Amino acid sequence: MGIRNLTEWNDPIFRKTSRTVEKFDERLWNLLDDMRDTLEKVNGYGCAAVHIGVLRRIVVVNDDNGVIELINPTITDASEETQEVQEGSIAPGAPRGYVIRPKSVTVSALDRNGNPTTVSGADFLAATFCHEIDHLDGILFTDKVRKKNI
């Protein structure tokens, strides 16, 4: 497939709401493969489609067990227990900062074939799910930052 160019951090596209995916076809599969390749190239933890200029509700997350693809994801459960996590972005020019996130979350989504799937994550994986899903609604981690990391 291919490696896509990343959208610059200050691009206004990051403030837009991504659209729901309705077609599960070769075009979507190519996009998912490109997102995986791009994430691997930059050695990142997560990539929302908006990172490559596509306003679709798609997230790809790197996990110890491989890459998790989430289409139209929704956080369906979040722990009351929280954690402070240092976050940044694969977007060029992004700052870093500390954000409070749930310690664990459960996400409902669709897989690349349109089948329902549920994944759970704790610690950094939970924070990554939250961070990337926020992007789909035009929310940046800097909106939630408690202290910046200079």
Spans of features found by a protein language model:
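Positively charged
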Residues: 1-150
